[in-house]
Amino acid sequence: MNATGITDAVRADFDACLADADEGGALELAVGLVTSGGVSAEDVLLGLVAPAQVRVGERWESGEWTVAREHAATHVSRLTVDAVASAARTPVEAGPPRQVLVACSDGEWHVLPSHILAEVLRLRGFQVRSLGGSISPPELLSDVHQTGPDVVALSCTLTFNLPLAHRQIETCRCAGVPVMAGGPGFGPEGVWAYALGADLYAADARAAAGALLHRWPPVLCGESSVQAGAVEEYAALVRRRPELLAHLAYALRDVFPGLRPRSDGSDNSDGSGNSATSATSATSATSAASAASAASAREHEEGTDFLGRLLDSLAAAVFVDDARVFTGQLAFAAAYFAARSVEPRCLLAMTDALADQLRGSPRTRDTLSAGRRWLAAPETED
């Protein structure tokens, strides 16, 4: 047990509820801690729900859970956050309102961290408006003008969304509204948040609430360090993305069978030039062909999405001029592949294939070289 009163047994029970998508059990356990267990709602959100959701992601990454099971567990976590927040009594604060607009970066669909942040801020007496996932700069600007928040809290989980987050930060700053950034996508200790011009950074919801209470009202003090040359190379990578994706798919077609050229044609003959005589056989063949086609299409989509994320991480690393964005994605990819019995060394083939196509882009070339060194390091150590 720790200072919050949440025991290991309670954590195990909550994990089991998520694993079984047991909405009733999860809500009863979490809300009970608040209403009769003497645990604060904030501690339940940050000491029980948030760590459990991290473990959910780890189980998907390791291949233990399917995407569907991960989504079902996340749904239960979202319901739990709402129920715990509703069960808690929000303090009534005297004085002028403190308005916070909470949003996810453009392209970011990991909404639960921002959801938890919004509820923790409400519990601390802030007035919160939450916009949910993937808010474009124009949409964000429109809401800022309509609601007039004192600060925008921007959540980013995936590093390849950093260039899009930069546009949102710049949009808010042009409107005269400071930005607090949070989430693992902004790097260790918020290094990339500050590089993008954020005014504040918080590692978690408790730190965010504390920072805002300590420095209220927040002020514009951030400054972007993104360089013009990096923006130019990033834009070139974005323009060439379809071409580079096709090149990667060809180079890695033996690793991702679903990326191999597919034919939608079918041959229902019996091999002698005559059509199959059995209607049942024809139906079975059609069903089998449809199933195979669907599986192939799914493999193709998953493989293309995966390669696309690697490309986007390369582009984001170039944008912020920090190879750790790319090597971090390579680390995830290597673990993802290893858990699924795919040879992680195929990532070396990917970096080489990209390097062949991007010789004239110095920042991109340096980032790929850093990625290759990272991939080769375990072999060197052996």
Predicted regions: what is each one?
Residues 1-87, 247-267, 279, 291-361:
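Long amphipathic alpha-helical segments
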Residues 98-100:
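Conserved hydrophobic helix-helix packing surfaces used for dimerization/oligomerization
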Residues 116-129:
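Short helix-loop-beta junction
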Residues 130, 134-192:
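Cofactor-cradling patches in redox/metallo enzymes
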Residues 184-234:
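Peripheral docking tails and interdomain loops at the edges
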Residues 220-263:
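Amphipathic alpha-helical blocks and their helix-capping loop/short-beta junctions
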Residues 267-288:
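Intrinsically disordered, low-complexity tandem-repeat regions
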Residues 365-382:
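Short terminal or interdomain "cap/linker" segment that borders an active site or interface and mediates
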